[in-house]
Amino acid sequence: MIAENKDYVKPDVNTLPAVLPAVAIRDVVMFPGMSLPLSVSRSKSIAAINLALDSNKYVVAVAQKEAEVEDPKAEDIYRFGVLSEITQSLKMPDGSIKVFLQGIARVKIEHLDFNNIANSWFASVFYPADEKVSGPEVTALMRQLLDEFEEYATVSRRIAVEGVSFFRQIEDPSRLADTIASNIIVKTSDRQDVLEAVNPKDRLELLIKILANEVEIISLEEKIHSKVRAQIEKNQKEYYLNEQMKAIQKELSQKDDFQKEIDELRSKIKKNGLPKNAKESAEKELDRLAKMAPFSPESTVSRTYLDWLVNMPWNSSTNDILDLKKAKEVMDADHYGLDKPKERILEYLAVSKLTNSLKGPILCFAGPPGVGKTSLAKSIASAVGRKFVRMSLGGVRDESEIRGHRRTYIGSMPGRIIQGISKAKSNNPVFLLDEIDKMGSDWRGDPAAALLELLDPEQNKDFSDHYLDVPFDVSKVMFITTANSLSSIPVTLRDRLEIIDFSGYTEYEKEAIAQNHLIPRQMKEHGLKEGSLEIGLPAVKLIMRDYVREAGVRNFEREISTICRKAAKMYVENCGKTVTVTKDNLHDFLGVPRYTNFTTEENGVGISTGLAWTSVGGETLSIEASEISDGKGRIMLTGKLGDVMKESVHAALTYARSKGYGKGIDFNKTDFHIHFPEGAVPKDGPSAGTAVTTALISLLTKNPVKKNLAMTGEVTITGRVLPIGGVKEKFMAAYREGVKTILYPHTNEKDVSEVPEVIRKQLKLIPVKHMDEIVKIAFEKGEPKSSFKKSKTAPKKESAKKAAKSKKPAVKKPAVKKTKQVKKTAKKKK
């Protein structure tokens, strides 16, 4: 019950202003004397409240005609309101304001204008005179109103009957009418009519009619409930809701909405062309629904299931754009390079055009972040004219995310595959399964195992979702998955994917992407018109070398965005003068360079440069070796190394010792420390074997490694150089760091063709089969001397000289040894 505030002192309306801020309120009509708590969240209403708080705390509270209108116009607001004072206000964290309004007097709004500057409505108001009425007729009306109100309180059970005694103490007819009107639950329009009734006598008569009508409606509702209760005594309780609906329909002559809904579902089952098994399941469920109570929990579950089943795009598909030229133009407009995936899509379209029927391919775009895997999938959907659906698999650990929940569970839903296809309203969309390598598994199941059926061309024609419980054909869907690393994808799942590698961009490709895509896009986003910002090509190259180190262009674009923000500020401050970015003033925009090319410039004794590959692209790897005399023959390894790399270091030292390097060193009393800088970064793999071996030989022979030389390859204890992976990424990283010469395994020559020609021309690429070849090339002072060669060759040469001087037959035997030794030495050198 809303009561008036007796402690409030009503101001004199003659002293109040004629123009006040106005607040449009929904679902409630304010009355004089009424105290109303109100939560204000709309911007125009907040502005009006703030204006009132800053001045005299008075606002006009006026109801809007339709509560659903979020941004009402002048015609949506009534022309009678209540002058109200803000007695309390509280600003909430979400920006809204909670206020308490105290109604003061009726006002008639003569003009309602919106002020764009203040973002608020302003009302020019007229204060109608509060007429004083009395006499027997008024007294009779007041008594009749109180009787009707008491009956209303009795039948509605919304107001305690004892509380009616409070209203009988009110002697002023105007105040009585306003107080009762603020405490009954009726339509907003009826309340507004009471507010607009300026004469208290008219107001009393109107309220009597409203209350009498409301009492009649409530009595009719009670009568319907009584009939239903009588029927329940004769029939089973499970038909309670059905009988209630029949009683309501009999009284109000309304159509059976539940039966209408069943008829609509039956019509959809016939029209939507469901497959035989799906149609049988839908009809069976519909028959069950028809026997249920309309508002029972079971009927809600059944209706939801039928909605999913009949609204699935069983036969709805989009027509592919089979124009190869147009498809290529669409993909080229959005992405520079990426020839392999584009070529694969064009091949699919060509075959589809020739056969008129083809299963959707299941592709996997594998590569480092920021190279355009996800965005290319969107372009493919646009190029082939299909709907696009994206599902992120990162962090997914529940099998039900893929295959849905069974309907026996509360709140069960289809899996996200079926949800995505239903949302697309097409059975052949381009469906992107993003970050497939980031899935996990726990007690809820393994999502990767659930994907086996989905991504198998031989099985996905009958993909079974636990919720639908009928097979759905997803063979027409073009599935595209993305991954940064293939190693974390289960072998059985990887076997079902057609892998397309996305290697990092070259500097030349990044330059083209920056000039044609990144810079224009960032300028547009930051409001910079053409000609307001100029970024020179040398500055673009410097950004790539000194500020970003990545295979893709995500951080590259972020740096360009930083330049655009600072350029926008300078452009505004300099009154529209063009901002030019050069390599000389680049640090003013981006600060101190984050990276320096130091790796290949510091090679010396015990230092070599290797090449590594990670999921985010290629990297150069500096390797340092040091010896500690008076030790215990230990090998110390630092740099957060994996087991494979540790074993590679041991193999390298074994090879170096077997070749006799390290004359005069007592290996039993010397410790060797091998360090890989950037110790916080985990490192593993055998491909640094050649670089580790070279660093150890350099240390043992005190022969420095050549500058601007890097190498990669696995080494065995006999010195054979074995093949490695990530050739393209490693070579691109070496080129970026200023390396001039690269030694790589001979068996990887076939992979060199994948390296862009513009990079191959600027690098000296030397394939090697054995560590002996690397030893001849890698050192500043030439090939290091082996202690074994010296100890074995000198005595044999001396015996050969003695044999040459002697003519005795007995000396011929060493001469034969000389010949064999010469042949053996020649063979070894070869």
Curated annotation (Swiss-Prot):
Q: Tell me how this protein assembles.
A: Homohexamer. Organized in a ring with a central cavity.
Q: What is this protein called?
A: Lon protease
Induction (UniProt): By heat shock.
For this protein, the record's PANTHER family field holds:
ATP DEPENDENT LON PROTEASE FAMILY MEMBER
PROSITE patterns cross-referenced by the UniProt entry: LON_N (PS51787), LON_PROTEOLYTIC (PS51786)
Give the function comment from the record: ATP-dependent serine protease that mediates the selective degradation of mutant and abnormal proteins as well as certain short-lived regulatory proteins. Required for cellular homeostasis and for survival from DNA damage and developmental changes induced by stress. Degrades polypeptides processively to yield small peptide fragments that are 5 to 10 amino acids long. Binds to DNA in a double-stranded, site-specific manner.
Its gene is: lon
The Basic residues compositionally biased stretches are 802-830
Q: Which GO terms describe its molecular function?
A: ATP binding; ATP hydrolysis activity; ATP-dependent peptidase activity; sequence-specific DNA binding; serine-type endopeptidase activity
Q: Show the GO cellular component annotation of the record.
A: cytoplasm
